[in-house]
Swiss-Prot record:
Subcellular location: Mitochondrion inner membrane
Organism placement in taxonomy: Eukaryota, Metazoa, Chordata, Craniata, Vertebrata
Gene designation: Coa3
Region (Disordered) residue spans: 1-25
Record text on subunit structure and interactions: Along with COX14, core component of the MITRAC (mitochondrial translation regulation assembly intermediate of cytochrome c oxidase complex) complex. Interacts with MT-CO1/COX1, SMIM20, SURF1 and TIMM21.
Organism: Mus musculus
Protein name in the entry: Cytochrome c oxidase assembly factor 3 homolog, mitochondrial
Length: 108
């Protein structure tokens, strides 16, 4: 129950509180004082949420950067471990050597 003399906390006619009523600036013409107050409240809300948003953005950036570095490092590791082309070159050299030996053996 409200304190005595505090007034009716709810407007009995429309059920809205007498404060913080929603308005649509496109429908209602606002006074310069109302526009200034809206800007002031928006600025206060923005300043209140700025540190949290900045922290979240930094954490997201660090996470994406860590992912990029992990992929980059894994790529180098994977390429360094790859011996497929080396083995292929060794087989090609051995095949050329066998072909030369066959050519010499069957030669004149």
């Amino acid at each position: 129950m409200a304190a005595p003399g505090a007034g009716d906390p709810l407007n009995a006619k429309n059920g809205n509180a007498p404060f913080a009523q929603r308005i649509d600036p496109s429908r209602e013409k606002l006074t310069p004082a109302q526009l200034q107050f809206m800007r002031q409240v928006q600025l206060a809300q923005w300043q209140k949420t700025l540190p949290q948003r900045r922290t979240r953005n930094i954490m997201t950036g660090l996470g994406i950067g860590a992912l990029v570095l992990a992929i980059y490092g894994y790529t180098f590791y994977s390429v360094a471990q790859e011996r497929f082309l080396d083995e292929l070159e060794d087989e090609a050299k051995a095949a050329r050597a066998r072909a030369l030996e066959r050519e010499r053996a069957s030669g004149p």
